[in-house]
């Protein structure tokens, strides 16, 4: 089995995602959207999809660099704004993040990165309240499964059109959508600190982990069958541990049940109520 099994009919995927964005925006009672545009491929795909679904005048892309952000990332984000014609704002988060850590020693890259991600989401939700725009997410399926993201940071949104697409599938969709090649081919990075890259953080490439996740989830193959197919035991065990350990990041907060009807457990109705009286 190779990564060819991950290939999708990207024209059909586009149609599904455009309808998804339009329908979900309408169900929530909104007409426009806001999202963070980093200069990476995930947010670039969301930018193009949102533009096609809602029209550029109804989409706001927010660029939120930190002082260590790569100038290339900022330029790539601006390139997407120019290409799509969506509205944009630039918010410098350095002051907020540095003030948070003022007098704090030994924070390290992980804590700094988490605060950057949450600062960005804070700005997005404030803009949502200011303008009446719905926040669209930009986390892909690989990130969500591995827990490679910040809870209530970059993983926070009202709707997420790309959350069921593996990273390698995002590249395929990006080329179908004619995203500039310099964004598609660049090394994936959350750009949280200088020299950071996704695959260096994770310790493996997206192609190999996407294939393993596909075997585990879509094909529901057993550990023994996956290893027999050529996946190393240590790699399988590492990835499975990450998926299991980060389950809490893919859930709403768990509520302790006390009463007969509990929100999220047995008090559940269709989200898109047609009338609220």
Curated annotation (Swiss-Prot):
It holds the Pfam family NAD_synthase. ATP binds at residues 36-43, 138, 167, 189. Pathway: Cofactor biosynthesis; NAD(+) biosynthesis; NAD(+) from deamido-NAD(+) (ammonia route): step 1/1. GO terms for molecular function: ATP binding; glutaminase activity; metal ion binding; NAD+ synthase (glutamine-hydrolyzing) activity; NAD+ synthase activity. The keyword Glycoprotein does not apply. GO terms for cellular component: cytoplasm. GO terms for biological process: NAD biosynthetic process. InterPro entries: NAD/GMP_synthase (IPR022310), NAD_synthase (IPR003694), NH(3)-dep_NAD(+)_synth (IPR022926), Rossmann-like_a/b/a_fold (IPR014729). CDD domains: NAD_synthase. It catalyses: deamido-NAD(+) + NH4(+) + ATP = AMP + diphosphate + NAD(+) + H(+). It comes from the Bacteria. Deamido-NAD(+) binds at residue 118. Mg(2+) binds at residues 42, 143. HAMAP family: NadE_ammonia_dep (MF_00193). Belongs to the NAD synthetase family. Homodimer. Catalyzes the ATP-dependent amidation of deamido-NAD to form NAD. Uses ammonia as a nitrogen source. This is NH(3)-dependent NAD(+) synthetase.
């Amino acid at each position: 089995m190779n990564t060819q099994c991950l290939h999708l009919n990207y024209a059909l995927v586009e149609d599904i995602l455009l309808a998804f964005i339009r329908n979900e925006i309408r169900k929530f009672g909104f007409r426009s959207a806001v999202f963070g545009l980093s200069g990476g491929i995930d947010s670039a795909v969301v930018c193009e999809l949102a533009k096609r679904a809602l029209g550029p005048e109804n989409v706001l892309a927010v660029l939120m660099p930190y002082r260590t952000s790569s100038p290339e990332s900022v330029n790539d984000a601006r390139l997407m704004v120019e290409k799509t014609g969506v509205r944009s704002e630039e918010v410098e988060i350095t002051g907020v993040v540095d003030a948070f850590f003022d007098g704090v020693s030994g924070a390290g890259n992980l804590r700094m990165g988490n605060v950057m991600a949450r600062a960005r989401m804070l700005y997005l939700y404030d803009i949502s309240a200011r303008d009446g725009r719905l926040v669209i997410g930009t986390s892909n399926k690989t990130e969500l499964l591995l827990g490679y993201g910040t809870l209530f940071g970059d993983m926070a949104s009202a709707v997420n059109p790309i959350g069921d697409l593996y990273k390698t599938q995002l590249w395929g969709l990006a080329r179908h959508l004619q995203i500039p090649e310099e964004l598609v081919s660049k090394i994936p990075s959350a750009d949280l600190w200088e020299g950071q890259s996704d695959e260096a953080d994770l310790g493996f490439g997206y192609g190999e982990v996407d294939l393993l996740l596909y075997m585990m989830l879509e094909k529901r193959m057993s550990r023994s069958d996956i290893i027999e197919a050529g996946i190393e035991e240590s790699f399988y065990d590492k990835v499975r541990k990450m998926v299991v350990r980060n389950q809490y990041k893919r859930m709403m907060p768990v509520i302790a049940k006390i009463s007969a009807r509990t929100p999220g457990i047995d008090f559940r109705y269709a989200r898109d109520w047609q009338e609220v009286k």
